Amino acid sequence: MEQAAPSSPLGNVIARIASASKIAGRKAGDVTLIAISKTKPADAILDLIDQGQRVFGENRVQESQEKWPAIRAAHPDVSLHLVGQLQSNKAEEAVALFDCIHSLDRPSLVTALAKAQDKLGKRVPCFIQVNIGAEEQKGGCAVADLPALLAQARDAGIDVIGLMCVPPAGIEPAPFFALLDKLADDNGLTQLSMGMSDDLEIAVQLGATYVRVGSALFGSR
């Protein structure tokens, strides 16, 4: 396994995370980089693996089923996260394939995931996705519904480790990241999945523990 060259896209993103962490008085190791590989071919993924990247994210269950089993057979130390919306009827397939789910956002999905986990005998850590900007077109639970959804998930035996958000596009993301951090604190959660290619520095400075980066690593889709 090689190490990412500082001038490579991966090396550049790692340096950005390290710089933002230093400014915030955090250790670089406090933040995990998720390489978002949706729509990208196996060769592009394998190139990042060869450079040392070990955590990847996908948006769709079906696409992941088509390309990831072979990659993971060759690289069993790679971790795969689902960051896109999850249909309840795909819950069992998601539990079987993924190591973490970032898009738990409604009671029906809690029920489906709990059933799938019991059937497969596998517990998958989950983030609750919060619709932090109250946008009708986006997934995520409403801020006001978070305590009830979290309680339901915990009662169902789901390991909720943190919160995830996608702030509204085109406006300053910092207030939304700060709100997600506060919601996590208020609900006893320590992990925050927030920040992408264009705003990862702000997210890291406001407490992100996972950043989801695609275009800065793979180029525009």
What residues fall within each predicted segment?
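Conserved alpha/beta-domain cores
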Residues: M1-T190, M196-D198, V204-L206
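Divalent-metal-activated hydrolytic enzyme cores
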Residues: T209-Y210
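Expand to "…catalyze enediolate/carbanion chemistry for C-C bond making/breaking, isomerization
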Residues: V204-Q205, L217-S220
